[in-house]
Amino acid sequence: MAIKANEISSLIKKQIENFTPDFEVAETGVVTYVGDGIARAYGLENAMSGELVEFSNGILGMAQNLDATDVGIIVLGDFLSIREGDTVKRTGKIMEIQVGEELIGRVVNPLGQPVDGLGELNTGKTRPVEAKAPGVMQRKSVSEPLQTGLKAIDALVPIGRGQRELIIGDRQTGKTSVAIDAILNQKGQDMICIYVAIGQKESTVRTQVETLRKLGAMDYTIVVTASASQPSPLLYIAPYAGAAMGEEFMYNGKHVLVVYDDLSKQAVAYRELSLLLRRPPGREAYPGDVFYLHSRLLERAAKLSDDLGGGSMTALPFIETQAGDISAYIATNVISITDGQIFLENDLFYSGVRPAIDAGSSVSRVGGAAQIKAMKKVAGTLRLDLASFRELEAFTQFGSDLDEATQAKLNRGRRTVEVLKQPLHKPLAVEKQVLILYALTHGHLDNVPVDDVLDFETKMFDFFDANYADLLNVITDTKDLPEEAKLDEAIKAFKNTTNY
């Protein structure tokens, strides 16, 4: 059989035309140093700040330092499996995390991977971990209350949906308990909660998750955990991951509460990374942009305008102080970023006042706009009363001769302190808070022994649930007080059934 040259040439031409090369072009570099959660790579000349890079073993990193000769990378995974001389390539992408309703009830790490042993997660949706905060015209004033269920907060330092309220205090003063109670109180309030645990012991996080699960709060809660044993890059990225998950719900018209527990540990992790990346240290060895670290995170919390769906994201960041020093660097930074702070005091905590909220140092810059009408009426003078009581209490240590008015103020103050105490994980519905505060401010507790105030409160709630539920319903439905004469009559009817 004769071979025809023209047939062979046409076949070769056809194959050349249909040839598709089986390779991809990627800019690669070589790892020159790796250790303590960071790596340096030579050869990634066109890498961008914040760009994801991929090491030869599949682990991802994020470009942070763009120097003339090399790129400083934070490693988002096990840096021990990376070796000097390994190749690293650009991906052309920024870091994204999976978001969506499928995350509710799950415990995930800052990369969005489940760590609760309940199976794989694939939400099908992602959002950038770092996102631009809503602009001025995209926001709306905070006007809806976010009830925490804690009398001391809802009466003295009210929080609104879309607010940023700092919780600050020494270690072991009940900061996490305040946040867990606030999450528990969102049951049935059409609220999604995200608890971001940064740099905590895994056993502690496990305890918090078990508490939330046992009390039915995991049905509307996502837990993001970067434990103390994990590399610094994961602790640094964790709050932004939590914010990205919250934004998905906020931009879909829903309401979200995000707890960052705590940002002091994130700042320490960022300081560690910055020093390892040879960035110049500033005050307390923190880098110069440590303010921006927290401001760009907390500015993402907002109450969106009606045009954008009216959703909200409320932030409760934590800062741990040393010996009550709220004038420290990170503490003052975050105080200046947030819309108020709740200061938890050591002395109050150990004297049995729990939650240990210092009414003098705590403030909400949203204030009455985040309270229902009924609460405004009963809690209006509470802060002043408490402040003058503390002043009088200090003054009376030097003398015992007191006139009747001063004695009455002291008696009312002691009962106020008792009323604001609350057992752990027992948040209180707002109508019951209004009821007990009404009884306090209208003198119904003046003849109740101080030690019996909490017992009086419990019995009064039971009595109202059984006999005067309609009065409580008026507060729930109208957000205002019922007729004062009816309320006084009902409280007197209760007192007649007791020895008070």
UniProtKB/Swiss-Prot annotation:
Q: Where is this chain's protein located in or outside the cell?
A: Cell membrane
- Known EC number(s)? 7.1.2.2
Q: Which reaction does it catalyse?
A: ATP + H2O + 4 H(+)(in) = ADP + phosphate + 5 H(+)(out)
Sites where the protein binds ATP: G169, D170, R171, Q172, T173, G174, K175, T176
Q: How does it sit in the membrane?
A: Peripheral membrane protein
InterPro entries, per this entry? ATP_synth_asu-like_sf, ATP_synth_asu_C, ATP_synth_asu_C_sf, ATP_synth_F1_a_nt-bd_dom, ATP_synth_F1_asu, ATPase_F1/V1/A1_a/bsu_N, ATPase_F1/V1/A1_a/bsu_N_sf, ATPase_F1/V1/A1_a/bsu_nucl-bd
Main location per UniProt? membrane
Q: What are the protein's UniProt keywords?
A: ATP synthesis, ATP-binding, Cell membrane, CF(1), Hydrogen ion transport, Ion transport, Membrane, Nucleotide-binding, Translocase, Transport
List GO terms (cellular component aspect). Answer: plasma membrane; proton-transporting ATP synthase complex
**Classification via SUPFAM superfamilies:** C-terminal domain of alpha and beta subunits of F1 ATP synthase, N-terminal domain of alpha and beta subunits of F1 ATP synthase, P-loop containing nucleoside triphosphate hydrolases
User: Which residues are listed under the site Required for activity?
Assistant: S362
The record's annotation in Pfam families points to: ATP-synt_ab, ATP-synt_ab_C, ATP-synt_ab_N
Sample GO molecular function, one term: ATP binding
Similarity section: Belongs to the ATPase alpha/beta chains family.
PANTHER family given in the database record: ATP SYNTHASE SUBUNIT ALPHA, MITOCHONDRIAL (PTHR48082:SF2)
Oligomeric state and interaction partners are given as: F-type ATPases have 2 components, CF(1) - the catalytic core - and CF(0) - the membrane proton channel. CF(1) has five subunits: alpha(3), beta(3), gamma(1), delta(1), epsilon(1). CF(0) has three main subunits: a(1), b(2) and c(9-12). The alpha and beta chains form an alternating ring which encloses part of the gamma chain. CF(1) is attached to CF(0) by a central stalk formed by the gamma and epsilon chains, while a peripheral stalk is formed by the delta and b chains.
Q: What does this protein do?
A: Produces ATP from ADP in the presence of a proton gradient across the membrane. The alpha chain is a regulatory subunit.
The protein in question is named ATP synthase subunit alpha
